[in-house]
């Protein structure tokens, strides 16, 4: 009897883990762009800066790798973890 209770608990735990894993993949994929979406998103992202060329270069590079560009012209990087966590050798943010 104790063994069947253990098996049921184990199956419930595995099921909950798989459901959690599925939802985490759905949330992670929420910001996924197609590569063709990068240029228009970066054009808007870099629209408020006076350094448009470097902003566009790095934004498109980051978007090509991360397939995500944060909303707005500044900040909101927490919505794109890959974009947010990519740093230069000096430890500064690589993505605008």
Swiss-Prot record:
InterPro entries linked: GASA (IPR003854)
Induction of expression: By auxin.
Organism per entry: Solanum lycopersicum (Tomato)
Any single Gene Ontology cellular-component annotation: extracellular region
Name of the protein this chain belongs to: Protein RSI-1
A Pfam family annotated for this UniProt entry: GASA
Summary of the tissues where the protein is detected: Expressed very early in lateral root development.
Stated family: Belongs to the GASA family.
Transmembrane segments: none
Compartments, as annotated in UniProt: Secreted
PTM comment text: Six disulfide bonds may be present.
Keywords per UniProt: Disulfide bond, Secreted, Signal
Leader sequence segment: 1-29
Domain of life: Eukaryota
